[in-house]
From Swiss-Prot:
It holds the Pfam family Cpn60_TCP1. GO terms for molecular function: ATP binding; RNA polymerase II-specific DNA-binding transcription factor binding; unfolded protein binding. Belongs to the TCP-1 chaperonin family. This is Molecular chaperone MKKS. Widely expressed in adult and fetal tissues. Expressed in the developing heart, brain retina, limb buds, as well as in the developing neural tube. Expressed in the embryo in the first and second branchial arches. Expressed in parafin embedded tissue sections of brain, kidney, retina, olfactory epithelium and the ependymal layer of ventricles. Detected only in restricted regions of these tissue sections, including the ciliated border of renal tubules, the connecting cilium and the inner and outer nuclear layers of retina, and the ciliated layer of olfactory epithelia. One of its GO terms (biological process) is cilium assembly. SUPFAM superfamilies: GroEL apical domain-like, GroEL equatorial domain-like. It is found in: Cytoplasm, Cytoskeleton, Microtubule organizing center, Centrosome; Cytoplasm, Cytosol; Nucleus. ATP binds at residues 192-199. Component of a complex composed at least of MKKS, BBS10, BBS12, TCP1, CCT2, CCT3, CCT4, CCT5 and CCT8. Interacts with STUB1. Interacts with BBS2 (via coiled coil domain). Interacts with CCDC28B. Interacts with BBS12. Interacts with SMARCC1, a component of the SWI/SNF complexes; the interaction takes place predominantly in the cytoplasm and may modulate SMARCC1 location. Interacts with DLEC1. The lineage of its organism: Eukaryota, Metazoa, Chordata, Craniata, Vertebrata.
Length: 570
């Protein structure tokens, strides 16, 4: 008998944020995350100390999934960001950096947690109300008559992921493929409730990125021998399909627990095989041309199908089942019981395809909204990062269909929001404190901490020691290289703002970001030219960024409100 140990008492810590260890750990986490932010973000190599593969990334989903944090405060932060990313796919780094900045800034102030939380909530409501209003000059409506805005959005996502290691030509090629794949998932017939289809990403490593392509329907990898043996003759009316999610190998894997009782001299193998052959006869009688099985098909049943010119493909895997059901219209069959004819589906044709050294069955649908993105890359690491980026871009396009706006990127939304909040608080402080019941001094310091946190996120885009500026007309971010900074004449040094909307030849004045400047009212009228020049802009997903802003502030408030941390050490 193993030695029994007495249970250790739980460890209770008060005011966790007052601990210097927690503060320093939070600062380190912020540094790691902030250094990944933006197109010139630094890559991180993650690997387990006990071995395993090395993962190179700058994306929040991969970074936080592989980053081990132990303190409960950090777990709250990382879990909140991961939950946001699982729902919206984008703006994870933005959310994490803003949350860390808010916590650090509030901790330096002489404010009670209750007051800080109340003021943070008010300042958040100012931001969200403005971003949702028609007066917002950070928000651009999506024109569905053109693909320019969609391409800008996809291009912005691709260029913000340096671990994909794409050239400009490759970025344009992949961006166009992502948009094409997305458009293929939109049904032609619009009903009251539109249901988007699905795009499957198939790997082809060791090939040029520009060899990537999009195909309607579905690719199922197979050997060259299988293709020669199984491809049927074409039929004018299409091919009838049966889709099985249960094993057709004759095993008892689905029998569950218990005892199987068999009569004397009865062969279980022969009995099961006869049942499988009876199923095969039923499929032949029902004029099924193609049998797809998630698991294994018995060799004798395969031979039976082959002799009757029925194509049988097994081991397709669970990941393709949903897509196969959409492509064929078939309902997955989960037993060997008599089959109802309504469970069958159909495809237009099945043909062979070869890409690189791989061979595929290509299922061509009748009208299904399923397509395959054959994604090529030079190595495994770049392919994994590119796959994750393509999935993010697809999801962001879906979100944009639901809420057809984009936000200006390149840090301009953050600096513009900070300028808007500063001006609002400066001119309406008396009315705000009358409603909220705090002093103007507390409101001003809380607003400064909030705006500084937003500006720090924008400043995290600069990784090479350059100067970060804000113009005092639009409140947009401007970046100047370290070796060309010229405080005397910024207009000769600067080119365009972070999002690309404005150029430095306009009559503008600038101030160094995070320096002291008088609050100003940023122009809240978006120029009409912006609507036509969206293809040249850096933009972010409206839905994802708005959610990220809310999650960051709410998580910071939750952490600031922590009084005790109780850990079970057993």
């Amino acid at each position: 008998m193993s030695r029994l140990e007495a249970k250790k008492p739980s460890l209770c810590k008060t005011e966790p944020l007052t601990s210097e260890k927690v503060r320093s750990t939070l600062s380190v986490l912020k540094g790691v995350i902030a250094s990944c932010y933006g197109p010139s973000g630094r890559l991180k190599q993650l690997h387990n100390g006990l071995g395993g593969c090395v993962y190179t990334t700058s994306q929040s989903s991969a970074l936080l999934r592989n980053l081990s944090v132990t303190h409960p405060v950090l777990k709250i932060l990382t879990s909140s960001v991961q939950n946001h990313v699982s729902c919206f796919s984008d703006c994870g780094l933005f959310t994490a950096i803003l949350c860390c900045n808010l916590i650090e800034n509030i901790q330096r102030l002489d404010l009670t947690p209750a007051t800080a939380i109340k003021l943070n909530k008010y300042l958040l409501s100012l931001c969200t109300s403005y971003l949702k209003s028609e007066a917002c000059s950070c928000r651009i409506p999506v024109d569905f008559r053109s693909t320019h805005t969609f391409l800008s959005l996809v291009h912005s996502i691709l260029t913000s992921k340096p671990a994909c290691m794409l050239t400009r030509k490759e970025t344009d090629h992949i961006g166009a493929l992502i948009l094409k794949a997305f458009l293929l998932t939109i049904p032609e017939s619009t009903e009251e409730r539109m249901v988007l289809g699905k795009s499957i990403i198939v790997p082809l490593k060791g090939q040029r990125v520009t060899d990537s392509t999009v195909l309607p329907g579905l690719l199922i990898e197979a050997s060259e021998v299988q293709l020669r043996r199984l491809l049927p003759t074409q039929k004018a009316s299409g091919l009838r399909v049966a889709l099985f999610c249960t094993s057709l190998s004759g095993d008892f894997s689905n029998a569950g627990e218990g005892v199987v009782v068999a009569h004397y001299q009865v062969s279980l193998e022969n009995a099961v095989l006869e049942q499988l052959l009876n199923l095969g006869r039923r499929l032949v009688t029902d004029h099924v041309d193609l049998v797809l099985c998630q698991k294994v098909i018995h060799p004798s049943l395969k031979q039976f199908f082959s002799e009757r010119h029925v194509m049988a493909i097994d081991r397709v895997g669970v990941t393709l089942m949903e897509s196969l059901s959409k492509v064929t219209g078939a309902t997955p069959i989960g037993s060997l019981n008599p089959i109802v004819s309504t469970t069958y589906g159909s495809v237009k044709d099945v043909c062979s395809a070869r890409f690189g050294s791989k061979h595929f069955f290509h299922l061509l649908p009748n009208e299904a909204t399923v397509c395959t993105l054959l994604l090529c890359s030079r190595n495994d690491t770049a392919w994994e990062e590119l796959k994750l980026t393509c999935q993010t871009a697809m999801h962001v396009l879906q979100l944009t269909i639901k809420e057809p706006w984009v936000l200006l990127g390149g840090g301009c939304t953050e600096t513009h929001l900070a300028a808007y909040v500063r001006h609002k608080v400066h001119h309406e402080a008396e009315a705000i404190v009358r409603d909220d019941g705090c002093t103007q001094a507390k409101l001003h310091v809380a607003a400064e901490a909030f705006c500084s946190a937003l500006e720090s996120v924008a400043g995290s885009l600069e990784h090479d020691g350059g100067e970060i500026l804000i113009d005092t007309k639009y409140g947009h971010l401007w970046s100047c290289q370290a070796d060309s900074a010229s405080v005397g004449n910024w207009s000769d040094t600067l080119s365009r703002c972070g999002c690309g909307l404005y150029n430095s030849q306009e009559e503008l004045s600038w101030s160094v970001l995070r320096s002291t400047y008088h609050p100003f009212a940023p122009q809240t009228c978006l120029p009409q030219a912006a609507l036509g020049s969206a293809s040249n802009l850096t933009v972010d997903c409206f839905t994802a960024k708005l959610s990220g802003l809310q999650v960051a502030v709410e998580t910071a408030n939750l952490i600031l409100d922590l009084s005790y941390v109780i850990e079970d050490k057993n």
